[in-house]
C-alpha cells in the first residue's frame, strides 16, 4: 500500500506519511530498490521503526524524508493482561506441566525458518542446567515446525520443549518465565522484546537486523562464540548455538543481576502515549 500511495502522489497533491516495517536489506533486487527509492521520495515522510532501518534507508536510498518513530506499545494493557491466571491454568492442564514450578524461557512469534528456532535446540548440548525448559508460543510453517520437533526428538530433548501454539495473551506466560529468547535471522522491530521488558523480564536475543541492539542499548563488537550483556539482557551472534548456550548459562547463574525495576524503566520511550506525541508533532509539522 505504501508504494501505491506514493505512486498516486505523483498525480495528486496530498500529504503522505508512510510507515515501513521491514528491513531494507531484505530488498535484494536492484530494480525493486530503484522503484522503492523513487516512489518513497514522493512521500512527505517515511517512518522507520528502528535506527538500523532508518540508517539503511538513508544509506541505500539517499532520501532525506526518513523519520525514526518506534512502534507504539500499550504498556498498561500488557501489564494488566499478564495477571490472567486462566492462561497459565489452561496450559498446565492441556500440556501436563506446571508453569508455577518449572524454570523456563519463552519464545514467542511466528514459527518460520527466519526465526532460527533450531539454534536453541542445538544450544542444549552446552547448557549446564538440567532444569531449564523452553516454552514456544506461536504457530507458523507446519513443515518447519515438524522439522524442529524432529530435531528435538533426535536429540532426546522432548522433555525440554513445550509447543503451546498461538496464544491471544502470551503475557501471563512471559511474566512467569525467567526471560524471553529471540533467535531470528532478521527482524523489522521485534515487539516481543519491548513487551518482555515491560514485564521486567530480561532478554536473550540474536544480534540480528534490526532492533535487538537498539532495544537492549548494547554497543560493541560481537565475535563468534561471544556474548555481550548488560542489565537488560544478553546479545549473541545469529545462529551461534555455543554463544546462545553461554547466554542461557550466564542468565541462569546470574539472574539477580537483571533488575526488574531497571528493565521496566527502559521501555517508557516505546509507550503508546509517547509515540502518539511523536506522530502528532510530525503531522503538525507537515500541515503547517
Region locations from a protein language model:
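A conserved mid-protein helix/loop that constitutes part of the nucleotide-sugar donor-binding site
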Residues: 103, 107-126, 143-147, 242
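A conserved, positively charged/aromatic
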Residues: 16-44
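A short, active-site helix/loop in glycosyltransferases that binds the activated sugar's phosphate group
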Residues: 43-80
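An aromatic- and histidine-rich active-site surface loop
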Residues: 1-12, 25
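Short hydrophobic beta-strand element within catalytic cores of glycosyltransferases
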Residues: 202-206, 211, 215-217, 225
Amino acid at each position: 500500500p505504501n508504494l501505491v500511495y506514493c505512486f498516486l502522489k505523483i498525480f495528486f497533491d496530498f500529504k503522505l506519511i508512510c510507515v515501513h516495517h521491514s528491513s531494507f536489506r531484505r530488498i535484494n533486487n536492484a530494480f525493486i530498490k530503484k522503484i522503492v527509492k523513487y516512489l518513497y521520495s514522493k512521500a512527505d515522510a517515511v517512518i522507520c521503526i528502528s535506527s538500523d532501518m532508518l540508517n539503511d534507508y538513508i544509506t541505500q536510498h539517499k532520501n532525506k524524508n526518513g523519520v525514526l518513530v518506534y512502534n507504539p506499545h500499550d504498556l498498561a494493557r500488557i501489564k494488566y493482561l499478564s495477571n490472567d491466571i486462566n492462561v497459565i491454568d489452561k496450559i498446565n492442564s492441556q500440556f501436563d506441566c506446571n508453569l508455577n514450578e518449572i524454570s523456563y524461557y519463552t519464545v514467542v512469534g511466528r514459527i518460520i525458518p527466519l526465526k532460527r528456532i533450531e539454534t536453541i535446540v542445538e544450544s542444549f548440548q552446552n547448557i549446564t542446567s538440567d532444569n531449564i525448559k523452553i516454552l514456544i508460543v506461536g504457530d507458523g510453517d507446519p513443515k518447519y515446525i515438524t522439522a524442529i520437533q524432529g530435531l528435538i526428538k533426535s536429540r532426546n530433548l522432548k522433555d525440554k520443549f513445550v509447543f503451546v501454539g498461538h496464544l491471544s495473551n502470551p503475557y501471563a506466560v512471559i511474566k512467569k518465565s525467567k526471560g524471553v529468547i529471540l533467535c531470528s535471522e532478521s527482524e523489522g522491530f521485534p515487539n516481543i522484546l519491548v513487551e518482555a521488558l515491560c514485564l521486567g523480564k530480561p532478554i536473550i536475543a540474536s544480534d540480528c537486523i534490526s532492533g535487538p541492539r537498539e532495544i537492549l542499548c548494547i554497543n560493541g563488537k560481537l565475535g563468534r562464540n561471544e556474548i555481550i550483556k548488560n542489565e537488560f539482557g544478553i546479545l549473541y551472534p545469529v545462529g551461534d548455538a555455543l554463544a546462545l548456550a553461554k547466554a542461557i548459562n550466564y542468565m541462569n547463574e546470574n539472574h539477580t543481576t537483571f533488575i526488574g525495576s531497571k528493565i521496566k524503566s527502559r521501555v517508557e520511550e516505546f509507550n503508546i502515549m509517547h509515540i502518539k506525541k511523536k506522530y502528532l508533532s510530525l503531522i503538525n509539522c507537515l500541515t503547517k
